[in-house]
Amino acid sequence: MDGSVGTGRQVGEIGAHVKGHNQNSVGICLVGGITASGKNHGEYTEAQWQSLYKLLQELEAEHPKALICGHRDLSPDLNGDGVITPKEWLKDCPCFDVWSWLDSEQVVNLDHLYKE
């Protein structure tokens, strides 16, 4: 959780992260963020936040028309009301609102900072 960035699949390779969206997306995985019992809590180290922010800037420069979002944001709108609510999420990750975080321009998300 030192913020190192590794490559699982190359950009252009089909991922296995969000059913129905794998062919046209790049998946990013943050290591950690879960409790010992396996519950998501979305807390990451300062180094991870900095690396994620930098990686997203690089990917956005390479793919300027791409939509940056979390797995949960690609869940179906089951009740058709135009809003994807927590009850409709197929996955919780990344356990924080990606759009709000990016709009805040706060590199380290203090609400989801792992405290040692």
From Swiss-Prot:
GO terms for molecular function: N-acetylmuramoyl-L-alanine amidase activity. GO terms for biological process: peptidoglycan catabolic process. Transmembrane segments: none annotated. Residues 2-73 form the N-acetylmuramoyl-L-alanine amidase domain. InterPro entries: Amidase/PGRP_sf, Amidase_domain, EF_Hand_1_Ca_BS. To phage T3 and T7 N-acetylmuramoyl-L-alanine amidases. This is Uncharacterized protein HI_1494.
